[in-house]
Amino acid sequence: MSNKLTHFAIHIDDIERAKSFYDGVFDWGFNSYGQADFLQIKADKSETGELIGALQARKFSPVSEKLIGLECTIGVENLDEIVERVKNNGGQLLLPKTAIPYVGWIAKFLDTEGNLICAMQYDNSAR
């Protein structure tokens, strides 16, 4: 399929803090990739987990300003559980669980690095 998002990078200031946050919230796995301040993100912690993105230091940016980036939404099975994990792992909830009618439930939060992240529990009966 053409024009499909195939990778994302979450820009970070502290690699270990960000790794701990995303492990605690989404239970993702991580691989070193030969660069300091850069980790591949895997969809799970298995040896063969699908590579879906990266944590990377803001210094890899080609622009001098602090990168803010895209608003990415991560599909989850249980949004209430994810919201609790965000709170318990140092994130800041910006938008509590909110219905998007006929689509699902969304919450928005800042991670420990100040990035805006969305989590969505898809449910066409949401009202």
Residue ranges and their predicted role:
Residues 1-4, 64-69, 101:
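Short glycine-enriched loop/turn motifs at secondary-structure junctions
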Residues 2-5, 9-50:
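Core segments of cupin and vicinal oxygen chelate
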Residues 3, 10, 34, 83-127:
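Vicinal oxygen chelate
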Residues 40, 73, 106-108:
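Short hydrophobic/aromatic beta-strand element in the GNAT-like acyltransferase core
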Residues 50-57:
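A short, structured beta-strand/loop element
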Residues 65-92:
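Mid-chain, well-packed structural core segment of small domains
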